[in-house]
Amino acid sequence: MGASFLTGVLGVLIDLKPAALLINDKINDSRLLDNKRILEILNKLGLDLVREKLNKFSNEEIEYLYLAKTARECLELQKWHREFFNSVSESGEVLDKKVWAEANYQIGKILGYPETATLEYIRMQIEGIEKDNNYRSRMERNYYYMHSARYENEEFEAYDLRLNLAVNEYLPVTAEIMQANIKKRWLD
């Protein structure tokens, strides 16, 4: 089971994020949720799951998983994810900047990302700002989402650090794997 799946589930369980947007990944010719045990575990944890297959941007159909403590949150995330998909062309070009920006803002909010990071991501995309070395180095050193240039440390403390501490406590094997990547920040 992938670290992104586990950290997404954990983020919801510790109330860091209202919902998680995951992918039913293919592993060894089967999909993650083909293992019914995982669905049973999610149910025992009190989590709801909505599944939807989409195939925009490629010929491959991707099954998205909207996971939260309530079906209402799952459906809200699904709604905004669809809005995002509808605001871009098959090639990924933004068709409606206002709809695209609002969809990304709402998705970031539902995923629990710091607002400063979400707003900078939207601004960079809308204004077509080049991804410079500072941008690339922030991507290289942080997990989970694109941190803003100005508030990177505050965002790390508000989201990443809380999730990483929970991963250390509840998912020690995953923590070990994630900490092996010495380029990524962990508890500092």
Descriptions of predicted regions:
Residues 1-95, 103-106, 113-188:
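A conserved ligand/cofactor-binding region detector
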